[in-house]
Amino acid sequence: MSVSQNTETPGAPAPARQSGSGVGRVLVAVYAVLAIAATGRSVFQIIDRFHEAPVAFVLSASAGAIYVVATIALGARLRRLALITISIELAGVLVVGTLSLLAPALLGLHSLDPFGRDSTVWSAYGAGYLLVPLVLPVLGLLYLRGGSARRVTG
């Protein structure tokens, strides 16, 4: 019997969760979609009208980069990198979301509209993306926490 099949032996490593199934697969897929959406949006905004809201557009590009790294980290089961990236993501959503509502001028936003021309991925806590940017890092951290309790790496 191989070590990966022997789950009864005390002290034996727990079997790793399959990366291609279950909640992990859905989480990676949602992160991938958000990575593409955020990166595409920010590239367009930077090329088309960077002068209108440079801070907001750089924040959108940063969000896109964070989603790309989180997608790769979750897919490759790089738990520590995923934990760091998703924690930064949550902090970014909370800080940018709050600033976009309380002090939009600090971000270079001209309106509170989360669907506006100069809004970021994280404006109004991601309301322009149906609040997925607010919920996703919480789900990601819970997923990683659950994995660590069972000695799972991803």
What function would you assign to each model-found segment?
Residues G116-L139:
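Individual transmembrane alpha-helices with interfacial aromatic-anchor signatures
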Residues I72-L99:
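Loop-to-transmembrane helix junctions at the membrane interface
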Residues V23-L27, S42-G64:
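Transmembrane alpha-helix entry/boundary detector in multi-pass membrane proteins
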Residues L90-T120:
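C-terminal halves and exits of single transmembrane alpha-helices
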Residues S2-L34:
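Cytosolic juxtamembrane helix and N-cap/initiation of the first transmembrane helix
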Residues L144-G154:
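Membrane-interface capping segments at transmembrane-helix boundaries
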Residues A32-G40, A56-G75, A91, G128:
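Core segments of alpha-helical transmembrane spans in multipass integral membrane proteins
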